[in-house]
Amino acid sequence: MTENIKTGTIGVNIGDLFPLIKKFLYSNHEIFIREVVSNAVDAMTKMKAVASGDDSAIEDYSEDDLKVRVSLDEENGILTVSDRGIGMTADEVEKYINQVAFSGMSDFIEKYKDTANTGIGHFGLGFYSTFMVGKTVEIVTRSYKEGSKTVHWTCAGTPEFQLEETNDEHQIGTDIIIHLNLEDEEIKNDFNSKDKIRDLLKKYCRFMPFPVIFGKKQKWDSSLGKNIDTDEDDDITIEALWNRRPADVTDDEYKKFYHELYPGNEEPMLWIHLYASDPIDLRGILFFPKTRDKNFFIHRDGISLYSKNVFVTDDMKGIELVPDYMQLLFGVIDTDVELNVSRSYLQNSGQIKKVSQYIVKKVCDKLKSILTEDRKKFEDGWDDIRSFINYGFISDSEKFYERAKEFAMFKDTDGKYFTFDEYRTLIEANQKDKDDNLVYLYATDVDSQTTYIETAKDKGYSVLIFNEQALDVLALQTLEQKFEKSTFKRVDSDVISRLIDKGDDAGVKFNERQEEVLRESFMSRLEGQHGKFFNVTFADLGKDSLPVIVSQSEWGRRMKDNSKFQSNSLFMRMGDIYTLTLNTASPLVSHLASDLLSETEEKLKPIQDDIDEKDKVIKEINEKLKDIKFEDQTEEQKKERQDAEEAVQKARQKKQEVYKDNAADNKIISQIIDVALLSAGILKGDALNKFLKRTVEFIK
């Protein structure tokens, strides 16, 4: 039963809509099938994500139902695409369907014209491609949200629409019902045919992550002399199986080929066309996908192997034809090597090794030529190919490094690019330590490590930017082995004077008592903070620098970074260890040390006298027993030493308690610690809230 009917005008001039779509998005009408199915897949992807939290909260949910079902009523010219995705409420239909143009359709098209062909349609915009073939389009949908009603939207290819909320029964999900414009002979011939729709689905949707069902599978019925439907759904989706030989093509054809193989991906950064007949016949196209800001992942099925256009495998694991690091690429390799489906045969073939060596050589030669001939293009694409280069360094450090060192690059925090030789020349004069080691400083996050980066720059040092997801941190270990007398240090792993130790001992130093009172006072406040472990050190950072900085050792960070690529790693389960370095040149820290000494002097004097006396006793005992082996000492002698050591330990604990009690309510210590933790991105939650309140109090 209809509860509410709304009519209105779509937020776009329909006369302007089709020319814009044709100009920017759809070179031919058949692309609408991809857009509609992609929207359905997108809706089910969201449903799966929602259900992963608590699928019992979703009515009649079953992951087995996550399928796109496509049907065609040839008699009436009605094409329906149904999904079991998240569906839409009336408000969502209003937002995503009726209000396509937020500030004008032209602006919307302009914003997305470069990405609109990436496979997953922009719901609303991709949906409107259906009007290229349909004279009327309906949406019947029900949201997964509790209490949602069925929504029915209708538009006849004009700015007017009708939107209804009903109590009609409808499963969660969406039906897109396209009434084909059969008055157009081209549309009638191209789209009102089950065979042609099936071909289009195979062309555009065969690699979708959910089943795409089009009718039923058929079998031959000899008694009827024809094929008849079975009860089994005809799922047109398959593994990444393609059967298209490479040929000399234009850039646009390369891109189109790539999108046919991998619908939904961004355009590739570059591609390499393999073409050889000696020493072995080899054809293929390898694409470098855009990988910046994405998690590292080896696509084992990214490269498909063919032999004379016959599919062999898309699982390259264990096959020496393609090194592991090449499996970051996408594409097709076609060779006439005598192949057998046996995995061991592939692994042991001498011809396979020759093919592999040729592929690596051609890829490296191509990258080197791009750097030489069009450096800007290479630099623009570097962030997309760096994972490939870095993984090559890690997995094949000897052979691959010798080729890749000619074109591999560093990027600094200012966004400038350098070859290895260029960068060494840049820093060689200024970034050597007292032992003549060249120190490469690097950061992994410019925003969170700004303080450390600027401190290094103030010293005239250059800082590289490494992307942890791009395997930079793992690759640098290989580079350290290859670069003569060189080391890489993360810019926030220590104070700059220790990162590049020039052997200069000049600077403000604290005496033993100052260091002790500060160390014990700060450690008493840091103990157990934020689930981290801390130690306190001292260094002259300059009187204009922060009073304190927090760092994590290079070794600790590397172990942690390495563990990201290892399952169940010990280092992933270990707590982080940080160093808090107090600036001895800071007037604030110096005054704080004086205040703490003054505040604790009276209570500490008798305790320190007691410690000195007990240390004297231990020294006398050790002197008395120095010539007696431990196993030859009497139980009485052992107990005498043990009691003396326990006594001095208890006295030291009393001393620590004095420091702890005195520092407990010291707002200056709290503020200094929190400023350091905040700059390191550690201060969060309740601790951050307390810091902000304390800061306001200081201002008052």
For each feature predicted by the language model, list its residue ranges.
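GHKL/Bergerat-fold ATPase module in large chromosome/replication-associated machines
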Residues: 119, 137-160, 166, 181-700
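GHKL (Bergerat-fold) ATPase N-terminal catalytic module, capturing the glycine-rich phosphate-binding loop
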Residues: 1-191, 199, 599-601, 605-612, ...
